[in-house]
Structure formats: C-alpha cells, structure tokens
C-alpha cells in the first residue's frame, strides 16, 4: 500500500546508517 514509504526507508537506511 505504501510503496513510497518503503523507498524512503531504503534511502534513509543508506543515508543514516
């Protein structure tokens, strides 16, 4: 349902981790 949220999660993981 929230594909955009998953995309953001992947991006945030690479930026914040």
From Swiss-Prot:
The tissues in which it is expressed are: Expressed by the skin glands.
Main localization is: secreted
Keywords of the record, alphabetical order, are: Amidation, Amphibian defense peptide, Secreted
Q: What GO biological process terms are annotated to this protein in UniProt? A: defense response; neuropeptide signaling pathway
Q: Does the keyword Secreted apply?
A: yes
Could you tell me which InterPro entries the record lists for this protein? Bombesin
Pfam (any one): Bombesin
Q: Which GO terms describe its cellular component?
A: extracellular region
Q: Does the keyword DNA repair apply?
A: no
Q: List locations, semicolon-separated.
A: Secreted
For the modification Methionine amide, which residues carry it?
Answer: 17
Q: Which family does the record claim for this protein?
A: Belongs to the bombesin/neuromedin-B/ranatensin family.
What name goes with this protein? Ranatensin-R
Q: Taxonomic lineage of this organism?
A: Eukaryota, Metazoa, Chordata, Craniata, Vertebrata
């Amino acid at each position: 349902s929230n594909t955009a949220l998953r995309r953001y999660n992947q991006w945030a993981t690479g930026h914040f981790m």
